[in-house]
């Protein structure tokens, strides 16, 4: 997984204050990575093969689960934490409103991909409208979600560093960890680092305390790798 240098995101990637946004950006890059895998799968994979179809379903289900967890953390923990600190700035509050609104637009697109997969499965062996439909809705999801991620990195994430100290941001991270639970957090880290190069993996793992790095290597990654995806 190679970190993408999107236009206008350097402030977010390196932080406008003391808040370390490494894991947030790594998660965004993992979503982009899986969108590429999803599009490639729809274009070329033999979904009539049961084993391949199962691995695609596993990858897609994990993507949806991670996106739901990520957006829920933002909508229920991160943005509400920022709002009182940014109450003096209508521009900043408008950005947070836009982030939440964009999340609402993405959810129906996930359902549309689910429906297109079902249609594709139902038309296997016949004509190709199911295949065409699947490619079309994946294109829409990819365009919408990557646009949202770029918008958030450009305008949303810098608000974290502007509003919170490093200690306050760590406290937000602990709250998200308690909400998600250790097992879900372990799956998240294994998912983020799936296919990561040595430098990116070291940057993300370096944010974990040593016992959790040991858990990643001994438990989370081996468990993650047992399931074929994509």
Predicted regions, residues:
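Small-residue-biased structural context
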Residues: 1-230
């Amino acid at each position: 997984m190679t970190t993408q240098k999107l236009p206008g995101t350097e402030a977010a990637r390196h932080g406008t204050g003391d808040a370390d946004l490494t894991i947030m950006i790594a998660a965004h890059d993992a979503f982009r990575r899986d969108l590429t895998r999803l599009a490639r799968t729809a274009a070329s994979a033999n979904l009539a093969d049961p084993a391949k179809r199962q691995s695609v379903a596993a990858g897609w289900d994990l993507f949806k689960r991670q996106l739901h967890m990520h957006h829920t953390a933002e909508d229920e923990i991160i943005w509400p934490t920022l709002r009182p600190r940014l109450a003096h700035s209508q521009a900043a509050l408008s950005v947070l409103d836009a982030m939440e609104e964009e999340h609402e637009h993405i959810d129906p697109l996930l359902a549309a991909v689910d429906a297109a997969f079902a249609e594709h499965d139902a038309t296997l062996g016949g004509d190709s409208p199911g295949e065409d439909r699947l490619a079309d809705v994946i294109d829409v999801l990819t365009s919408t979600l990557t646009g949202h991620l770029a918008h958030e990195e450009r305008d949303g994430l810098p608000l974290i560093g502007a509003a919170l100290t490093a200690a306050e941001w760590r406290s937000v991270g602990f709250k998200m960890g308690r909400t998600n639970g250790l097992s879900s957090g372990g799956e998240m880290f294994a998912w983020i680092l799936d296919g990561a190069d040595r430098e990116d993996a070291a940057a993300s793992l370096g944010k974990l305390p040593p016992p959790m790095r040991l858990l990643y290597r001994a438990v989370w990654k081996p468990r993650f790798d047992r399931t074929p995806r994509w």
